[in-house]
């Protein structure tokens, strides 16, 4: 669709329709133009983009090479206004609900049940239903039949034909560092799943015979915080990350850490189904959450432990680990157009085992520099969007997760790693994304279960498992079915390909929000984002980019 649009509307005509032809100061700001000795009037879009190149980096976190129209704000002051006096640590957030369900949630007399994923796990594990007949999967199947293909065949598991089943089976293996144990049943006490990760290091993923680099006696790396951030960016992107950032742990930042978590376990169903009993961890995990405690202990002594295994029921975080390194993982953009495996399509869930791999390599890289770190994956420490927002990876969106100016909604993670490696903190950004979300709402219109708010941002959360105290949107995680539709229909999804029109749209969104309604309508008319294809075979016959990610946006 975008090709047709590009071929029938000239740059000059497009500028006229925007009211930007012959414009300058109104679009970019007279002060910025004057400060950089740039003209106050632009004849066409090329003039506008040339001016942007001249401003490149002046108003952005240079570590991510944000374009000129991305500005930075003060530390701890993102575009979703925060009243830090209202922010309190709370227990058990994760991206599908809470670790702590209401006490009577499992009672047959409970009337407020709406957590479709937990209920589906109960249906599958305890009631013996087929996976595709559970509420979680069935809601996605119904949406596909009503909106995409009336003859949609969900297959045996609800994801599609046998190829789709095989793809999601392979794509999800390793999620949250839970791999199928190839030695299960071959020795006494073996468990079906295997984890190599602890919260203060990686026990696996190294070359056999290579000495533990932390045991060597040569001096550790010494660099400035700015140099360290740049080498971390280079290493993280080499391992598979996209954007990166850093935050200093202050008293305010500590407020966004969970009060309690269950290490490495994502979701209340892990407790309901005793999932921790099926996983071999280097340090055992029990079936309940334990508090995160900041302590004055050596930087290499961070740990978690449970009383049942001789520990002290806490996650101990050394105060010496006073920096947070944040990063995201880019998703396979092309696959979204063919996301027939709703919910939990491989285009989204492939990110979770990648989190494990990238985190492992980053932790070992930090160890190789002579420093310490504590990871924990996507479910660790606190809500990812908060860390991503504060470190300038992106802005909070209507769907609650962040949208990045460079990669749009096509990332996952806002992953966070604690370390004593000195890092220069990156600032929150303003790319006009939050303001655009106020007038857009396409994601809410298309959400199959209406988990996304149609209202404006608010300080108080209407849901018991979301934190209050920031002026933003609060996703109803109880209704979310992991369908990826909100990501695919977002106008920012494919605005990352460096075409002139996408850069113009994004720069105008950032500098002239009066056009936001126009761009929202233009998305509906021209369809920037991918649209679902009813053809099952087209994606399988296509030549995909490496790891499915477009290479032209790097």
Swiss-Prot record:
* Residues binding [4Fe-4S] cluster 2, per UniProt: 447, 480, 483, 486
Query: What does the UniProt keyword field contain?
Result: 4Fe-4S, Cell membrane, Iron, Iron-sulfur, Membrane, Metal-binding, Oxidoreductase, Repeat, Signal
Tell me where the signal peptide lies: 1-42
Q: Which cofactor does it need?
A: [4Fe-4S] cluster; corrinoid
Q: Which residues form the 4Fe-4S ferredoxin-type domain?
A: 425-457, 471-500
SUPFAM superfamilies in UniProt: 4Fe-4S ferredoxins
Q: How is it modified after translation?
A: Predicted to be exported by the Tat system. The position of the signal peptide cleavage has been experimentally proven.
Pfam families linked:
Dehalogenase, Fer4_7
Would you name any one GO CC term? plasma membrane
| Localization | Cell membrane
Question: Which EC numbers does the record give?
Answer: 1.21.99.-
Q: What class of enzyme is it?
A: oxidoreductase
Give the PANTHER family listed for this entry: IRON-SULFUR CLUSTER-BINDING PROTEIN (PTHR42827:SF1), IRON-SULFUR CLUSTER-BINDING PROTEIN-RELATED (PTHR42827)
* Stated family: Belongs to the PceA family.
Kindly provide the name given to this protein in its UniProt entry: Trichloroethene reductive dehalogenase
Say which species the protein is native to: Dehalococcoides mccartyi (strain ATCC BAA-2266 / KCTC 15142 / 195) (Dehalococcoides ethenogenes (strain 195))
Gene name linked to the record = tceA
